[in-house]
């Protein structure tokens, strides 16, 4: 029964490390014996590559275009099994500049539901592009598919801006679809006072920073080999960070309706933590950078 499945979604600004974070977290959940399916909802189709050790999985939309209709597909053509038995699907998207990428998500989820893909699962994880919360990309939220949203962010201004926008999208459908915000995952960029900053943002958004993932080069080393850190470097401290995050998500009961803030409030927060200074500080920083310049 779909009603008994924990349906979670990872949203976040493009380039924030959302797909990497989500796959490493799913690997941690799978290690605990959870039965999981990943539904990639990003046109880049990179939501399952670390689980499958592949460049990119063939997407539902791509195969449907080849066959003429999604009804002509078989489930085992688009649903593959990856690391620790995790089921993997990519919805895909249209050619750049043509059509609505969000439509691929709608098509994919409907196809999966109609063909029994949700049977015998504990978790379904949607990995969703989060720069633009348009109708299509908001579909897992709008239709009540994803009940728990985790926003991957960092202490950088645009990542926080995207997180606030996603919170606004969650709020819009919280009462009609029952979706809730599970927390912010800080995927560190080594910004000054990053932990304090994201904790403060979480408080303003009426949520929690569920985990702080430190920056470590082993993540890139694993990615180059198309593996999660948990598989590539099982005993590495970074692998344990993802295991801790997975455990926190499994045990999370703090699911809230977010309270998004205005752009002015976001800028005030950045000023408060010294990330975005006033004009005087800005000019001082430029002068300092100029002084450090080396003429060759």
Curated annotation (Swiss-Prot):
Keyword match Repeat: no
Keyword Transmembrane among UniProt keywords: no
Cofactor binding summary note: Binds 1 [4Fe-4S] cluster per dimer.
The protein's required cofactors: [4Fe-4S] cluster
Domain of life: Bacteria
Enzyme class: oxidoreductase
Entry's Gene Ontology molecular function annotations: 4 iron, 4 sulfur cluster binding; ATP binding; metal ion binding; nitrogenase activity
PROSITE patterns: NIFH_FRXC_1, NIFH_FRXC_2, NIFH_FRXC_3
Reaction(s) catalysed by this chain's protein: N2 + 8 reduced [2Fe-2S]-[ferredoxin] + 16 ATP + 16 H2O = H2 + 8 oxidized [2Fe-2S]-[ferredoxin] + 2 NH4(+) + 16 ADP + 16 phosphate + 6 H(+)
Classification via Gene3D superfamilies: P-loop containing nucleotide triphosphate hydrolases
Known EC number: 1.18.6.1
Mod. after translation: The reversible ADP-ribosylation of Arg-103 inactivates the nitrogenase reductase and regulates nitrogenase activity.
Alphabetical keyword list: 4Fe-4S, ADP-ribosylation, ATP-binding, Iron, Iron-sulfur, Metal-binding, Nitrogen fixation, Nucleotide-binding, Oxidoreductase
Record-stated family: Belongs to the NifH/BchL/ChlL family.
Function recorded in the entry: The key enzymatic reactions in nitrogen fixation are catalyzed by the nitrogenase complex, which has 2 components: the iron protein and the molybdenum-iron protein.
Assembly: Homodimer.
PANTHER family per UniProt: LIGHT-INDEPENDENT PROTOCHLOROPHYLLIDE REDUCTASE IRON-SULFUR ATP-BINDING PROTEIN
Name the UniProt record assigns to this protein: Nitrogenase iron protein 2
Source organism: Trichormus variabilis (strain ATCC 29413 / PCC 7937) (Anabaena variabilis)
Gene, per the UniProt record: nifH2
């Amino acid at each position: 029964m779909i009603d008994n499945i924990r349906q979670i979604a990872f949203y976040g600004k493009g380039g924030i490390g959302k797909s990497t974070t989500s796959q490493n977290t799913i690997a941690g959940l799978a290690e605990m014996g959870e039965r999981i399916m990943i539904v990639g909802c990003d046109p880049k189709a990179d939501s399952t590559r670390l689980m499958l050790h592949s460049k990119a999985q063939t997407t539902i939309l791509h195969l449907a275009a080849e066959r003429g209709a999604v009804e002509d597909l078989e489930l085992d053509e688009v649903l593959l099994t990856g690391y620790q038995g995790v089921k993997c699907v990519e919805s895909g998207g249209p050619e750049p500049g043509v059509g609505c990428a969000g439509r691929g998500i709608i098509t994919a989820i409907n196809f999966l539901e109609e063909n029994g893909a949700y049977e015998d699962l504990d978790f379904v994880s949607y990995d969703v592009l989060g720069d633009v919360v348009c109708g299509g990309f908001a579909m897992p939220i709008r239709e009540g598919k994803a009940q728990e949203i985790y926003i991957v962010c960092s202490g950088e201004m645009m990542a926080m801006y995207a997180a606030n926008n996603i919170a606004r999208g969650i709020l819009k459908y919280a009462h009609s679809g029952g979706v809730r915000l599970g927390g912010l995952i800080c995927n560190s960029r080594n910004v000054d006072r990053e932990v304090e900053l994201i904790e403060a943002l979480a408080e303003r958004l009426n949520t929690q920073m569920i985990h702080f993932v430190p920056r470590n080069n082993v993540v890139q080393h694993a990615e180059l080999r198309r593996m999660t850190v948990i598989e590539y470097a099982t005993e590495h401290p970074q692998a344990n960070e993802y295991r801790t995050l997975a455990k926190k998500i499994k045990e999370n009961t703090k699911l809230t309706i977010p309270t998004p803030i205005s752009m002015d409030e976001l800028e005030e927060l950045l000023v408060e933590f010294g990330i975005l200074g006033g004009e005087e500080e800005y000019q001082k920083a430029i002068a300092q950078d100029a002084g450090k310049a080396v003429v060759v």
